[in-house]
């Protein structure tokens, strides 16, 4: 198993960890009600997905 030869400094550790960022979710406008919603998920305000009513709202 690979083992670090030297202790990594706090600065280097934090610099490496700073690259791990949460991705910003992509919002699109709903085709029916034009409210912002997540892609590939039913619209929470009108309940449609792919031009079909899938949720009772």
Swiss-Prot record:
One of its GO terms (cellular component) is large ribosomal subunit. GO terms for biological process: translation. The keyword Nucleotide-binding does not apply. GO terms for molecular function: structural constituent of ribosome. Belongs to the bacterial ribosomal protein bL32 family. NCBIfam families: rpmF_bact. This is Large ribosomal subunit protein bL32. It comes from Streptomyces avermitilis (strain ATCC 31267 / DSM 46492 / JCM 5070 / NBRC 14893 / NCIMB 12804 / NRRL 8165 / MA-4680). The lineage of its organism: Bacteria, Bacillati, Actinomycetota, Actinomycetes, Kitasatosporales. The gene is rpmF.
């Amino acid at each position: 198993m690979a083992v670090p030869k030297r202790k990594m400094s706090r600065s280097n550790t934090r610099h490496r960890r700073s690259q791990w960022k949460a991705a910003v979710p992509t919002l699109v406008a709903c085709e029916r009600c034009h409210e912002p919603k997540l892609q590939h998920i039913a619209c929470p305000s009108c309940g449609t997905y792919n031009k079909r009513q899938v949720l009772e709202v």
